[in-house]
Every structure is written in C-alpha cells, then in structure tokens.
C-alpha cells in the first residue's frame, strides 16, 4: 500500500508511470508534446547525418506516445497544448485538463526608478535550439543596426560556445550589438526588462511561454509570434506577428520606436491582464480542484 495520497509526474512519460497509476492517484503534467521539438529540429537540420542524429535522440517519443494514451489524468498549461497532445499522442481530450502556469507578478514588476537604456531590446533564449526562433530576431537586428547603430539586444540565456547562434552573430557582424545575461534571479531579470524598451518572443512554438507572461508583467511593450499558446497568454496586449519572419520583427520594432507612448499604454494594460488571469492564487485553486477530483475518482 502506498504512503502517498497523490503522485504528480512532470512529463517523464515512462513505462514505470503506468505502474504508479495502478496503485496511486496520478496526475501527469505534459507541457507540450515533444513531437513539436522534433519537427522543428528536423526542419532546421542540415544534411542527412544531422537528421538521423535527431531521430535517434528523439527515439524516446515512441515510449511517450504509448504511455500518454493510457494515462487517465493529464494537466497541461494551454488549450493549444491540449489540442496538440490529443492530436500527436492520441490522448482523449476528456482526460486532459488545462491549468495555466502562474506568473510571479510581484517579482516581474515595473521598476519606475530604473531608466530605460536608449535603443535596448530584450529577448529570452533558454536553449540554443530552432524552436526558440532566435535567428529571426538576429537577422532583424542586423538590418536595424544600419539605422540604429547603438541598438542593443540583451539575450537572457547562456550562449553555447561555438554553437549555431554564436556563429550566426559573427556572420551577421552584430557582435557589438548583442549582450548575454545568464544565471540571473527573477528580480535581476526584472531589472533587465526595466532597462529595455521592447521585449521580443520570436518562438516557433510554445507550450506556454513564461517569457511572454513575464515581459507583460513587467509592463514592457511586447512583440511576440502569433503561434501555439502565445496568443492565449497575450490577449490583445502584444504586437503579434507571423513566425519565421525577421521582416515582421523589424517592422514591429520600428513601429514601437516611432510611437512608444501608445505601445506603453497597451503594455500597462497587459500587466493588469496578467495579474488578473495568471496569478498563482487562481492557478493554485485550479490545481486543488483537480487534485481532489483525481483522488476521489481513484477511490471509487
């Protein structure tokens, strides 16, 4: 007999989880189906050897699909992820609950005593992978620097030495315009947002997209791709653009630089939107409801 009232598993989707489900109430968290990561990795792979390597790396997907379809209770952070989990993993939609992630709006808050650095833009790249769409922002920066020589792009993340992004930055000759910040606390990230004039999320796919909510919580004008879960988070309070378009990023940046006051009004409203809809108190109540429901149905 288990000494646990409930097990919450974060997307291991391993065969052992099915054994756990037999003996204990189980909630499986699936952020998004990793089939999306494989799709974009293959799309941007160069040559057959690289594609084969990606297929081998993602071979665990066979197991995840077999496990996911047998799970009774799944929680995911967006309606878009629910749709994709049902489609790619074959899971019945009735087994999937949508509970958004919460945004720490007390840490990610406007800091009015900090002055914005002229022509500074900020983005987040948690990993050097195609899914994050950083390439398209870099191409936009390369064109914009002709008109804005002092343009600065702050990237929250750590570069992979001699990785794809570093090579592209050198190729575009924008080394002097790029500034990495890594190992920052939430409060330190909020300071970087406060220094910046525009936040960019150029992802090709997001299961939820913390950088979207965190930027909005800091009341900074946001440019974000109109894909996957992102419009669920932003509502009408961001400049939504097509994915995989450096020209759209460039155009949006120019528009905000030309008319910062009107975009700031939208950004201020965006913070209120985040506080009202993505606060942890509200999210916790949704989890509490799902937890009790899962335990009760297991015992029946």
Regions found by a protein language model. Give the residues of each.
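Short hydrophobic beta-strand element within catalytic cores of glycosyltransferases
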Residues: 221-224
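Membrane-proximal helix-turn-helix segments that form the acceptor-binding/catalytic region
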Residues: 51-74
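Aromatic "clamp/platform" in nucleotide-sugar-dependent glycosyltransferases that forms part
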Residues: 204
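Conserved acidic donor-binding segment of nucleotide-sugar-dependent glycosyltransferases
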Residues: 239-246, 255-261
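Conserved donor-binding/catalytic core segment of Leloir-type glycosyltransferases
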Residues: 114-132, 138-141
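Carbohydrate-associated surface elements
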Residues: 80, 102
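Nucleotide-activated donor-binding/catalytic signature segment of Leloir-type glycosyltransferases, i.e.
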Residues: 165-187
């Amino acid at each position: 007999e288990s000494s646990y009232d409930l097990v919450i598993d974060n997307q291991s989707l391993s065969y052992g989880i099915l054994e756990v489900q037999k003996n204990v109430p189980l909630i499986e968290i699936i952020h998004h189906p990793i089939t999306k990561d494989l799709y974009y990795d293959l799309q941007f792979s160069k040559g057959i050897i690289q594609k084969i390597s990606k297929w081998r790396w993602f071979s665990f997907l066979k197991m995840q699909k077999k496990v996911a379809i047998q799970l009774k209770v799944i929680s995911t952070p967006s309606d878009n992820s629910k749709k994709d989990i049902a489609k790619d993993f074959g899971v019945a939609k009735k087994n999937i609950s949508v509970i958004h992630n919460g945004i720490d709006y007390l840490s990610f808050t406007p800091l009015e005593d900090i002055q914005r650095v002229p022509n500074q833009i900020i983005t987040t790249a948690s990993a050097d992978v195609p899914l994050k769409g950083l390439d398209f922002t870099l191409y936009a920066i390369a064109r914009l620097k002709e008109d804005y020589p002092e343009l600065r792009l702050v990237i929250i993340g750590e570069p992979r030495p001699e990785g794809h992004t570093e090579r592209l930055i050198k190729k575009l000759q924008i080394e002097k315009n790029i500034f990495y910040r890594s190992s920052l606390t939430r409060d330190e990230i909020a300071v970087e947002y406060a220094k910046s004039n525009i936040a960019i999320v150029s992802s090709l796919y997001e299961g939820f997209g913390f950088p979207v909510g965190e930027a909005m919580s800091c009341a900074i004008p946001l440019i974000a791709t109109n894909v996957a879960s992102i419009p669920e988070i932003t509502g009408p309070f961001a400049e939504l653009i097509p994915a995989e378009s450096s020209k759209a990023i460039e155009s949006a940046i120019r528009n905000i630089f030309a008319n910062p006051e009107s975009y700031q009004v939208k950004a201020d409203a965006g913070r209120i939107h985040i506080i009202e809809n993505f606060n942890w108190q509200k999210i916790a109540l949704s989890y509490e409801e799902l937890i009790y429901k899962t335990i009760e149905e297991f015992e029946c």
